[in-house]
């Protein structure tokens, strides 16, 4: 069988086409302190400086060995773009949302004339362009964004779930607004060189909202992004935290190429629950990859591979203190696997 470039290999693997071996990639947060020290680009500055963001993203490939580059490193850029208060984080901690920006439809109306060439959204788009110009012919360029359900929750704050359960009119309005933004943002990423879009939608977890609410308030809005990317022949991967086992069949209806699952999900059960997507994951980022030994990582990797995982990788965002050697052991296991 012919050998493929990493870009070709991931393109084919995400579309269930034959490849020479498993790609070694990560669709969730990739940065670690060891990478920061190696490349000289550090959090929190790398969240808001395109050159530093690209440099740190590049380190996941040049220092660790992932066969792709991915930006950004957090899921707050979108909320900040729409006026939410943000705690900046530090060398080890990602930024977090501390203040919402929308209480009602009037507040939402004020956000509608946005410009993707402003704020941290513009920074991420510029980082995508930098990475694409350097690596786009050889490596997958993964553009990541928060999903519409979780973005709506960030923007609406603590009131979100109450509004959801009481059927307030701000809920569908916010979801329409957020998903339309997601589509525009994803298209801009693709224009700047991204070939794969990761949708990170943690609060749309089956554990939190159940199947009925997921089908009504998450599925159609996630699918809007996926459909737009399919028109551009751009692959999508959806990550939702928690034990999503009972919701995987519904998540598969989004049409994504890959469903990323965390360590709570049984891989064998997961692969039997979906018909269209491949299952991505699901090494425990804390117990295994951060605190485990290379031998324990090899054992956990073998278990996931034997269970039929489509792409072996981190089960959620990489912990910033994860040792490089541990990530490299997982990468070694992925690259040694043939389908």
Curated annotation (Swiss-Prot):
Impact noted for substituting residue 226 to A: In strain: NIH
Reactions listed under catalytic activity: methyl-Co(III)-[methylamine-specific corrinoid protein] + coenzyme M = Co(I)-[methylamine-specific corrinoid protein] + methyl-coenzyme M + H(+)
Biological processes annotated in GO: methane biosynthetic process from dimethylamine; methylation; one-carbon metabolic process; porphyrin-containing compound biosynthetic process
Residues at which Zn(2+) binds: 239, 241, 316
Enzyme Commission designation: 2.1.1.247
Enzyme class: transferase
Cofactor(s) needed for function: Zn(2+)
The keyword NADP is annotated on this UniProt entry: no
Pathway participation: One-carbon metabolism; methanogenesis from methylated amine
InterPro entries the record matches: Methanogen_methyltrans, Methylcob_mtaseMtbA, Mtase_MtaA_CmuA, UROD/MetE-like_sf, Uroporphyrinogen_deCOase
Activity control, per UniProt: Inhibited by EDTA and EGTA.
CDD domains: Mta_CmuA_like
Cysteines engaged in disulfide bonds, as pairs: none
Keywords: Metal-binding, Methanogenesis, Methyltransferase, Transferase, Zinc
Gene3D superfamilies for the chain: 3.20.20.210
GO molecular function, one term: [methyl-Co(III) methylamine-specific corrinoid protein]:coenzyme M methyltransferase activity
SUBUNIT field: Copurifies with MtbC.
Biological function: Methyltransferase involved in methanogenesis from methylamines methanol pathway. Catalyzes the transfer of the methyl group from the methylated corrinoid protein MtmC (MtmC1 or MtmC2) or MtbC to coenzyme M, forming the substrate for coenzyme-B sulfoethylthiotransferase.
Recorded family membership: Belongs to the uroporphyrinogen decarboxylase family. MtbA/MtaA subfamily.
Listed NCBIfam families: methylcob_mtaseMtbA (NF041608), mtaA_cmuA (TIGR01463), PRK06252.1 (NF004889)
Full protein name: Methylcobamide:CoM methyltransferase MtbA
Gene: mtbA
């Amino acid at each position: 069988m012919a050998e493929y470039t990493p870009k070709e290999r991931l393109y084919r693997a995400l579309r269930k086409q034959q490849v020479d071996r498993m790609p070694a990639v990560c669709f969730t947060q990739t940065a670690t302190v060891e990478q920061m020290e190696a490349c000289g680009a550090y959090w929190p500055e790398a969240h808001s400086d395109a050159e530093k963001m690209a440099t740190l993203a590049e380190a996941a490939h040049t220092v660790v060995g992932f066969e792709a580059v991915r930006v950004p490193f957090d899921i707050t850029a979108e909320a900040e773009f729409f006026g939410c208060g943000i705690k900046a984080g530090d060398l080890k901690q990602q930024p977090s949302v501390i203040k919402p920006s929308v209480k009602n439809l009037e507040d939402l109306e004020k956000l509608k004339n946005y410009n993707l060439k402003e704020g941290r959204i513009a920074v991420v788009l510029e980082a995508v362009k930098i990475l694409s110009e350097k690596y786009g012919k050889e490596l997958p360029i993964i553009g990541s964004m928060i999903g519409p359900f979780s973005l709506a929750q960030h923007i609406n704050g603590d009131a979100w779930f109450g509004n959801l359960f009481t059927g307030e009119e701000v809920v569908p309005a916010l979801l329409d607004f957020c998903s339309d933004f997601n589509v525009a943002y994803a298209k801009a990423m693709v224009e700047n060189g991204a070939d794969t879009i990761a949708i990170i939608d943690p609060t749309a977890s089956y554990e939190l909202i159940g199947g009925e609410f997921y089908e009504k308030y998450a599925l159609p809005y996630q699918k809007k992004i996926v459909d737009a990317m399919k028109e551009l022949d751009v692959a999508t991967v959806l990550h939702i935290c928690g034990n999503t086992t009972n919701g995987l069949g519904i998540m598969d209806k989004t049409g994504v190429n890959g469903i990323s699952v965390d360590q709570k999900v049984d891989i064998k059960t997961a692969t039997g629950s979906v018909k269209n997507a491949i299952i991505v994951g699901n090494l425990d980022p804390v117990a295994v990859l951060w605190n485990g030994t290379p031998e324990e990582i090899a054992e956990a990797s073998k278990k996931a591979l034997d269970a039929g995982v489509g792409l072996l990788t981190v089960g959620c965002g990489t912990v910033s203190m994860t040792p490089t050697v541990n990530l490299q052991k997982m990468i070694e296991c992925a690259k040694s696997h043939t389908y």
